[in-house]
Amino acid sequence: MEEYEAQLLVVEQALENAADDAQRQELLALKNNLQELLALTRDTGDEAPTDELPQQGNDLDDELQRLKSELSDLEAAGSSQTALDEERQLADLRTKYTAMVGEKCSAPHEHSWGTCYHNALICGVDDEVVINSEGVLDARLRVLFTNPTHREMLPCSYYLEGECRFDEAKCRFSHGALVTGSSIRKYNPPDFHKLSRSRPVFALLPDRLWHRGRVLCVNFVEQVCRVRLDGQDHKERERDFKFEELYPLTTDQDEDDELSSEESTSSMRDASSDEAESDMDDLEEARRARMVELSLFTYKPTDRLGAWEEFTRGIGSKLMEKMGYIHGTGLGSEGRGIVTPVSAQILPQGRSLDACMELREAANGDKDYFSVERKLKRAQRRQRKADEKAYVRESQRVDVFTFLNDRVLGPGESTQQSEQVAKKAKNNELQQHSTKTLNVETVRIADEIRRKQRDMAKVKQSLERNSGDAQLQKRLQVQMQSHKQELATLQAQERSLSKEQQTRKSKNKMFEF
């Protein structure tokens, strides 16, 4: 009797956990059979004849065996259904995580002092299945940290290229950290607008690690920041870093400001009505669509606005960007102003406006007829043609001395002419270079002249110090003579460069109006 009651209790528990209708029907039928069997057993009890007891015992044993077989079948079906559910859940997780490969995230890293989250890049999904802290199946992701602060976080450059000869356990650098998918957080992009004095930041040093420091000053125009690095192991604690080499850290004050801003925003939203919000959203969307349309269909000039600033110290275009200007649109808040800057024009001196208009009409109404750029280009073309004609004229001119050197003395005695030709070729070669190249070459030659003068001073000191050694004196004098010849050559080159630079300056003065 007790065994039947225990079997009935097991069937009732299985009935509570069953989700399939077919299983519930089978369990209900089995429960009814057990209840009837228990009722029959209680009714007959001790009243059953002795000759029927063996037959009744055999029936009970058969019923018990059938009950056990049905329970085992139900347990097997439940376990198989659970396994199928787990496989389906794992396949969905792998599909979800595979789609995240290549995305940025924030992943945990266990340090000696605790766990901290760092920005990382998802590079793959591990085959191993794990159970997270909540007892749920989960997969592990392989991530590479984008702002490594310790050597074990630093990605292996050979592994990224597929050429690392060591496995993950033996390599000194990281082949990717394995983290569970449930521990991944949202990526925290750097907010450079938060850069201010005493702001804690991570700075990238030549060892490819990000070191902690504090901001001393910020230049938002040049996008350069001076940082004082923490620790005593840095020889130069104060360094200048570009914005892309910094990562501003979040402080408690930032979190409080975000919370207060969220609270104020929520209160303002609660106070305003839904109709006003929809109207503002419609206006903002219409304005953005209009600005995008203007930027797409507005005339695009060949040169971008502010292209000339790379040759000057101008910051006008950068200030316009700070004030909200969108490249490709016109000036003004609505973007309907001019796109190209106003070009300066120089009218003929002493002529009336009517005469200037007649000149423009004679040029088929060319609007750029009096532009400064056009006049400068025209003057440059004229000067270039004049230089070419002068060079051809000088190269073809033959005087009496050249005739005597060529005809009477022979080609072996015309060294002076060859030097002149070489000098002209050198001057023509200098004319082909830009002003910036000439300035760099002048600085280099000046450094070589100073170095050669120092070498000559050292040789002179050696001559004075070793006046008694004849052999050494002879070698030092040969070195001194060689240094003098090289110095004379460098000084001649310096004079040629200086002459060319002076010629260009005088030409520029001639072109100024």
UniProtKB/Swiss-Prot annotation:
Compositionally biased intervals (Polar residues): 477-495
Entry keyword annotation includes Transport: no
Cell compartments where the protein resides: Nucleus
Bias (Basic and acidic residues): 496-513
UniProt keyword list: DNA-binding, Metal-binding, Nucleus, Repressor, Transcription, Transcription regulation, Zinc, Zinc-finger
Function: Transcription repressor.
This protein's name: Zinc finger CCCH-type with G patch domain-containing protein
Source organism (scientific name): Drosophila sechellia
Lineage, opening ranks: Eukaryota, Metazoa, Ecdysozoa, Arthropoda, Hexapoda
